[in-house]
Amino acid sequence: MKTTATKGVQAILIIIFSVIIASLFGALHNQFSYSVSSEFFTNFLFGNFGTNEWNLKNERLEASIVGIIGSYWVGLILGIIYVIIFLFMKTENNLKNIKNAILINIGFSILGSLIAYLIAKFFVDYKNSGIFMEFGTQNPQNYLEAAFMNTGSYFGGIAGIVAGIIYLLKKKQKLKIKRTSHNS
């Protein structure tokens, strides 16, 4: 049986891990989005996040910073959700299972972004998209694709938390079956 102090340290580690993974995802994801449309960042996200006032000389660095700012809080929320599950779930390799659930969550965010990008690329014309763009945007279709990628990653994250919880429930169920068969 783990002590309360050990559980508390592990809970903090889960939150830290979740925030770091989400931040890394945001920084890397924005590098791909920036490659699709730098205008989405210069015309929208940099102003939206206020980084355009920081006088950064490297737009790619700025895109990564925006990614971190836009995703660390999601990692914090997910970390708290997974800590609650961690504290009440009694399974073997509990910490490992939580880590895997967080990685599943990020995988779904990546998948959501990719699916949204493909939908924008092949099925949505920017003229009928309803996406607000600055007047004079040079590559509006690319802008739309980057905007869809951004939104898709959040929808993927929502699906990912569901998938992560299902994963944890299945792990718990397997342990319950395993314990029942050993007691028989």
Residue ranges and their predicted role:
Residues 90-91, 95, 128-149:
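Hydrophobic alpha-helical transmembrane segments and immediately flanking/interface helices
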Residues 55-74, 139-162:
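Hydrophobic alpha-helical transmembrane segments
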Residues 35-45, 114-134:
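Juxtamembrane non-transmembrane "cap" segments at the membrane-aqueous interface
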